Amino acid sequence: MDPYAFSDEAWCKELGRRLDHLREDRKMSRVELGEEIGVSQPTIRRLLDEGHGKLSILVAALRSLEALDQFETFIKPPPVNPALLRKKQVRRVEVG
């Protein structure tokens, strides 16, 4: 499957669909999810059915569904540059 063959809107809807499937797997209702993350049912509907919503709501939903670990596969963290790491360690020693 070519991921670039789909529109941004199609990907947003797919993300909402996958999040809704995860919610069902956790045996959590939409009402429970909304209450747990502090958003209204229209907001949950827009997120799960249409793929529209703020990133902060997406992160809160992933946390509520105990799925934040899946975020690592969504966007991989950048590799650590050993030279920069040493430089930061030296600064901590100098400042500390």
Regions found by a protein language model. Name each.
Residues E36, A61, F74-P78:
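Short acidic/histidine-centered micro-motifs embedded in hydrophobic/aromatic stretches
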Residues E72-G96:
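Short, charged recognition helix plus adjacent turn
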Residues E50-R63:
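Short, basic-rich loop-to-helix N-cap that marks the start of a DNA-contacting helix
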Residues K27-R45:
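Short alpha-helical DNA-recognition segment
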Residues M1-D25, F74:
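A short, Lys/Arg-rich alpha-helix, primarily the initiator
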Residues R17-L33, R91-G96:
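Short basic helix-loop element that most often maps to the first helix and adjoining turn
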Residues L19, R30, Q41, L55-L58:
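Helix-turn-helix DNA-binding elements, focusing on the entry/boundary residues of the two helices
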